[in-house]
């Protein structure tokens, strides 16, 4: 059977699109067409009599089943798809390549929406950081903010609207940006370009489709390496319920976070480890687990204070929590973000409540083969339980290989050992 053929044509929101002769010839001789409802409304008058139209709607699997049927019965005729802007710029051509990798694809692009908005603003865009929030969650946008990208182009959707974006930025203290919004770009009757403060944008509604360009008001922003302990909100004002800054930074080093993807912070308390990790390594997916309900507000307050969006907070007993490997699901743990919980390749155990081995055993059901577990053992005459002995026993019983411990005495605080463990087959 011949492989499927696609001709994917980019269009703007203009109600009377202009096409070069080559593209007009493709349309005139086409038999099977596809696109969204908006695209159909724009090109309907150009379609030949008797043309078949396949709507692009969710679920996409249904759309591609129709494509497979059409390709099978079309005797080699291409499926002509209309898509927004440049079909290879976060566009439908990428979806076709992923879903039907053997298909033959020809693309006729036009300007994408962010290019059109930059043109209207007479703004160079070679230095623009691009983030797509169309059908995607916040992580890449969070990363762009934390890394203080000076110019961010954003593709929006009905959930990630300009107002929602502005509200998120204000919530986490990223106020030093102005927002440019383009609505219905390419449509001479409906096109609108606005330049607003974040406060103004957060209170307005914008028609779809739209896109956003954020421009930082300041070119430089300094961030300290290590957040002072006194800057955090604490649990009941108890300064001992926070991993101290020098220990915190050494713990992050032991976790090897530049080369990790998913960090679990078990016993997060104030969120200091998660927040420090979020700001220093914004590529990470971070899951913070804490049994005390009152800590949820503390972690959220600290995350907002230090501009650390995207920490997924889970409140409940970790040993009863639903994790990726929990089958059947036990008690669902509460997440404030609703993001899928990825399998960790870095785990910090900051609190164990006397159940260190049980926690480690559960972690091992989801830890990646190259993952690492880090635990800070505190020696204190006030604590009858020897946490180092618990760690050694757990590692031995669970078949973990230990790394070399790091011994630290910080001022007049109790001595600490930063301990690491790996799956034995990886050492």
Predicted regions and their residues:
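A contiguous loop/helix-start segment that scaffolds small-molecule binding in enzyme catalytic cores
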Residues: 2-8, 21-22, 77-79, 149-240
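Class I S-adenosyl-L-methionine
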Residues: 1-106, 115, 283-286, 290-292, ...
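Helix-to-beta-strand junctions that scaffold the AdoMet/dcAdoMet cofactor pocket
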Residues: 281, 367-369
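Conserved SAM-binding loop of SAM-dependent methyltransferases across substrates and taxa
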Residues: 270-282
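S-adenosyl-L-methionine
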Residues: 291-325, 332-334, 338-342
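Conserved class I S-adenosyl-L-methionine
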Residues: 260-269
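Core SAM-dependent methyltransferase catalytic element
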Residues: 212-217, 410-427
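Class I SAM-dependent methyltransferase SAM-binding "motif I" and its flanking Rossmann-like core
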Residues: 14-15, 84-149, 319, 391, ...
């Amino acid at each position: 059977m011949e492989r499927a053929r696609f001709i994917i044509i980019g269009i703007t929101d203009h109600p009377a699109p202009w096409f070069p002769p080559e593209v007009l010839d493709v349309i005139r001789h086409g038999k099977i067409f596809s696109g969204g409802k908006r695209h159909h409304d724009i090109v309907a008058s150009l379609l030949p009599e008797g043309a078949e139209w396949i709507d692009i709607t969710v679920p996409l699997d249904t759309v591609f089943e129709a494509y497979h049927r059409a390709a099978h019965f079309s005797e080699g005729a291409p499926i002509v798809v209309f898509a927004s802007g440049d079909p290879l710029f976060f566009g439908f051509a990428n979806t076709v390549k992923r879903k039907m990798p053997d298909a033959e694809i020809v693309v006729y692009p036009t300007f994408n929406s962010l290019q059109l908005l930059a043109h209207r603003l007479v703004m160079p865009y070679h230095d623009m950081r691009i983030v797509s929030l169309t059908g995607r969650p916040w992580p890449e946008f969070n990363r762009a903010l934390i890394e203080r990208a000076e110019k961010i182009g954003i593709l929006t959707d009905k959930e990630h609207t300009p107002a929602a974006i502005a509200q998120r930025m204000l919530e986490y203290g990223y106020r030093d940006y102005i927002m440019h919004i383009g609505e219905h770009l390419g449509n001479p009757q409906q096109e609108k370009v606005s330049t607003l403060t974040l406060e103004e944008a957060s209170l307005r509604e914008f028609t779809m489709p739209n896109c956003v360009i954020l421009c930082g008001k300041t070119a430089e922003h300094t961030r300290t390496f290590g957040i002072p302990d006194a800057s955090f909100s604490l649990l009941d004002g108890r300064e001992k319920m926070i991993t101290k800054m020098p220990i915190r930074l050494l713990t992050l080093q032991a976790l090897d976070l530049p080369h990790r993807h998913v960090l679990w912070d078990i016993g997060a308390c104030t969120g200091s480890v998660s927040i420090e990790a979020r700001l220093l390594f914004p590529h990470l997916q971070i899951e913070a687990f804490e049994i005390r309900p009152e800590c949820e507000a503390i972690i959220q307050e600290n995350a907002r204070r230090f501009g650390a969006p995207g920490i997924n907070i889970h409140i409940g007993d970790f040993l009863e929590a639903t994790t990726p490997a929990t089958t059947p699901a036990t008690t669902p743990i509460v997440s404030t973000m609703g993001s899928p919980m990825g399998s960790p390749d870095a785990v910090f155990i900051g609190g164990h409540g006397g159940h260190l081995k049980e926690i480690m055993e559960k972690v091992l059901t989801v830890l990646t083969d190259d993952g690492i577990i880090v635990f800070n053992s505190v020696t204190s005459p006030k604590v009858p339980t020897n946490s180092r002995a618990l760690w050694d026993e757990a590692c031995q019983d669970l078949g973990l290989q230990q790394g070399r411990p790091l011994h630290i005495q910080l001022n007049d605080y109790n001595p600490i050992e930063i301990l690491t463990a790996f799956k034995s087959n990886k050492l």
